[in-house]
Amino acid sequence: MSRSLKKGPYVEGRLLERVEKMNAANEKRVLKTWSRSSTIFPQMVGHTIAVHEGRKHIPIYITEDMVGHKLGEFAPTRTYKGHAGSEKSSGLR
């Protein structure tokens, strides 16, 4: 279910302030954030935002295709290392 239109998209206020300040100063640096639920706005395009995934921050370069998505979609929280192999299948044939 999507968010109500009268509320508008969610973005952490401090994150948007920092991005707009960087746009005004025309500087590019990595912004750290824990706000995985923030929506990506057009002002963020071209910036690198390090999104927390539970252990560390994963740097994500924002492109135009990402606008409208959430930051957390691009920083997976679970690692899949594959199913355990059975000893029976590893024997000689």
Curated annotation (Swiss-Prot):
NCBIfam families linked to this entry: rpsS_bact
Keywords, comma-separated and alphabetical: Ribonucleoprotein, Ribosomal protein, RNA-binding, rRNA-binding
GO cellular component: cytoplasm; small ribosomal subunit
Pfam families: Ribosomal_S19
Gene Ontology terms for molecular function: rRNA binding; structural constituent of ribosome
Origin superkingdom: Bacteria
Gene: rpsS
Protein name: Small ribosomal subunit protein uS19
Function of the protein: Protein S19 forms a complex with S13 that binds strongly to the 16S ribosomal RNA.
Gene Ontology BP, a term: translation
HAMAP family xrefs: Ribosomal_uS19
UniProt family annotation: Belongs to the universal ribosomal protein uS19 family.
